Curated annotation (Swiss-Prot):
Pfam families named in the record: Cupin_1
UniProt GO molecular function: nutrient reservoir activity
Family annotation (SMART domains): Cupin_1
Official protein name in the record: Arachin Ahy-3
Alphabetical UniProt keywords: Disulfide bond, Seed storage protein, Signal, Storage protein
Signal peptide: 1-20
């Protein structure tokens, strides 16, 4: 009898699980059926004291299909983007600038310790604590601080607090993609930033309210609107925070963001600059192009606490695909940066010369979010029915989602078309349809001739005329052979 009862309970769970999966599939089955794709620009900008954040509408069908959310932020001189964490893994590409960032991994020890006064091992500006003897105050200890520079890709796991700071005169410009459809996101597919400091607008909240995801005019909606703009600590009572942190109410009020100036926002300006505890060789390495790719680990076996969280894929690095007449492409996946396996993401950075082409190809196992960094390119995308769902110029500042298996090709309209593509698989693979070692290249000649109704010489040309793998130089520099 007990066994029958256990089997019945197990069967009920299986039915419920299957029902929930079916329900999710029914809700998502039409999200990737497009008659037309659209290049998107940000439609919201949130100004702060030290910079601004631009966001794209995550309710857009293309973003829903890819399971991603896109934003772009700019940090001015001495600007600090205050700590936050997200409900989904993210990748951040540094298009411009340099500075420092930190990730706070729960349970990992602080490995950076402030030196005893007078030590020259580390360099940081001196700080003065009112009413406290400098010799008696505790030394600062915290988790690792990382340097970043132009071209770096930063991996930020879900639920891990992140902050970033610009210590240079050049603005930091960064593009961020959240993988909202990740298995690590146990909430719905909507992007959420959990701010840990300040009192600012949640960058994606307005889209959530527009989509009607919240309870209609109910108690829950009123409560969320009442708390809009607060950080995580704002929702806790003064008593709880005072007890939890063992501090007085004056400190708690700042923790809750009660003494904020309206213009401060998510990005604040640090007067006199931030006091950052980092080894001096880091500063040197990030002032010299081509250096600074390593995190200066101490040889300890890599765990989540010591994991490498960034890799440079910019212009100064060696390319995976290179043609001096056409351009270059650099990729990063879990084999290059193992932490990407946890995120389920990878990335690609490309530079294509004017009139050169990235041949028709498709992503075998990932959706792709392309962001045009500089210049423009004529892009065509084709769906499973052979319909051209995109046939326009992708311009600087625009983004384009290319769903998995949709074929895509691009021809640069600028001296150098620069782009970054974020992909929803930690080991994303592409298959080229034309060129050397492509689908066409590897078909038997007879199959080509009979599949496309060609003479054998024509089939041979279709297979072999393009000796390039992915990037093809401008057409006027090539001899195109034809059959009379």
């Amino acid at each position: 009898m007990a066994k029958l009862l256990a089997l019945s309970v197990c069967f009920c769970f299986l039915v419920l699980g299957a029902s929930s999966v079916t329900f999710r599939q029914q809700g998502e089955e039409n999200e990737c059926q497009f008659q037309r794709l659209n290049a998107q620009r940000p439609d919201n900008c949130i100004e702060s004291e030290g910079g601004y954040i631009e966001t794209w509408n995550p309710n857009n069908q293309e973003f829903q299909c890819a399971g991603v959310a896109l934003s772009r932020f700019v940090l001015r001189r001495n600007a600090l983007r205050r700590p936050f964490y997200s409900n989904a893994p993210q990748e951040i590409f540094i298009y411009q600038g340099s500075g420092y960032f930190g990730l706070i991994f729960p349970g990992c020890p602080g490995t950076f310790e402030e030196p005893i006064q007078g030590s020259e091992q580390f360099q940081r500006p001196s700080r003065h604590f009112q009413g406290q003897d400098q010799s008696q105050r505790p030394l600062d200890t915290h988790q690792k601080v990382h340097g970043f520079r132009e071209g770096d890709l930063i991996a930020v796991p879900h639920g891990v607090a992140f902050w970033i700071y610009n210590d240079q005169d050049t603005d930091v410009v960064a593009i961020s993609v959240l993988h909202t459809n990740s298995l690590h996101n146990q909430l719905d597919q909507f992007p959420r930033r959990f701010n840990l400091a300040g009192k600012q607008e949640q960058e994606f909240l307005r889209y959530q309210q527009r989509s009607g995801r919240q309870s209609p005019k109910g108690e829950e909606q009123e409560q969320e609107q009442e708390n809009e703009g607060g950080n995580v600590f704002s929702g806790f009572s003064t008593e709880f925070l005072s007890h939890g942190f063992q501090v007085n109410e004056d400190i708690v009020r700042n923790l809750r963001g009660e003494n904020e100036r309206e213009e401060q926002g998510a990005i604040v300006t640090v007067k006199g600059g931030l006091s950052i505890l980092v080894p001096p060789e880091w500063r040197q390495s990030y002032q010299q192009p081509g250096r600074g790719d390593k995190d200066f680990n101490n040889g300890i076996e890599e765990t989540i606490c010591t994991a490498t969280v960034k890799m440079n894929i910019g212009k100064s690095t060696s390319a995976d695909i290179y043609n001096p007449q056409a351009g270059s492409v650099r990729t990063v996946n879990e084999l290059d940066l193992p932490i990407l396996n946890r995120l389920g993401l990878s990335a690609e950075y490309g530079s294509i010369h004017r009139d050169a082409m990235f041949v028709p190809h498709y992503n075998m196992n990932a959706n792709s979010m392309i962001y045009a960094l500089h210049g423009g390119a004529h892009v065509q995308v084709v769906d499973c029915n052979g319909n051209r769902v995109f046939d326009e110029e992708l311009q600087e500042g625009q983004s384009l989602v290319v769903p998995q298996n949709f074929a895509v090709a691009a021809k640069s309209q600028s001296e150098h078309f620069l782009y970054v593509a974020f992909k929803t698989n930690s080991r994303a693979s592409i298959s080229n349809l034309a060129g050397k070692n492509s689908y066409m290249w590897n078909l038997p000649e007879d199959v080509v001739a009979n599949s496309y109704g060609l003479q054998y010489e024509q089939a041979r040309q279709l297979k072999n005329n393009n000796p390039f793998t992915f990037l093809v130089p401008p057409q006027d520099s090539q001899m195109i052979r034809t059959v009379a």
